Design a protein with these regions (language model features):
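C-terminal motif of bacterial Sec signal peptides marking the signal peptidase cleavage site
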Residues: 22-26
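Bacterial N-terminal signal peptides that target proteins for export
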Residues: 1-15
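Hydrophobic helical h-region of N-terminal Sec-dependent signal peptides
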Residues: 16-20
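Compact, glycine-rich, soluble single-domain proteins
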Residues: 28-31, 36-148, 152-167
Length: 167
């Protein structure tokens, strides 16, 4: 029986190695091109962001305007809006609003499977040092920058000061 022992051990080692290789291959990462971004085997998915409802309110002053939009995250991982750039303003800052108090912040959370809502009277973008006073109907380029996702470029319409989007 000792003569067969090393052969059996060798065969068992080969079977174990092949089995482990197959198991590890099955647990590999999903490819970066077009995966569904869902939760795979208990791992958080990547954020999947889209933007809707964006607009700039026509400013009553020449040097400052406000921007509003919604960022939808259909992915299983959270992200953060870290900055916004536009040729319309030399500076865009992110603001939260609690009660009557407005506070500048360095980022805004985009929750997994959730939305970030920037609305009039709520969290919003402040555009300062405008290059010109935008007029109703004009379209302004914005680039949204995130902590983990690629930047998103959008064209944003300028709406009347009294504009309120429909829900």
């Amino acid at each position: 029986m000792t003569a067969a022992g090393p052969g059996i051990r060798k065969a068992a080692a080969v079977v174990l190695t092949v089995g482990l290789s197959a198991a590890l291959a099955a647990c590999g990462s999903e490819d970066g091109g077009g995966g569904d971004g869902g939760d795979h085997a208990g791992h958080k998915g990547a954020p999947k962001l889209s933007v809707s409802g964006a607009y700039v309110s026509q400013p009553p002053m020449d040097d400052m305007a406000a921007g509003y939009l919604a960022v939808r995250n259909a992915g299983g991982g959270a992200d953060e809006l870290t900055s916004v750039t536009t040729p319309l303003a030399s500076e865009v800052t992110l603001h939260t609003t609690k009660g009557n108090r407005m506070k500048q912040v360095s980022s805004l959370d985009v929750p997994a499977d959730g939305r970030l809502e920037l609305t009039s009277g709520g969290d919003h973008l402040m555009l300062t040092n405008l290059t010109h006073r935008p007029k109703v109907g004009e379209r302004v380029s914005f680039t949204l920058h995130f902590a983990t996702s690629d930047p998103i470029e959008i064209k944003v319409p300028v709406e009347p000061t009294t504009y309120r989007p429909k829900d």
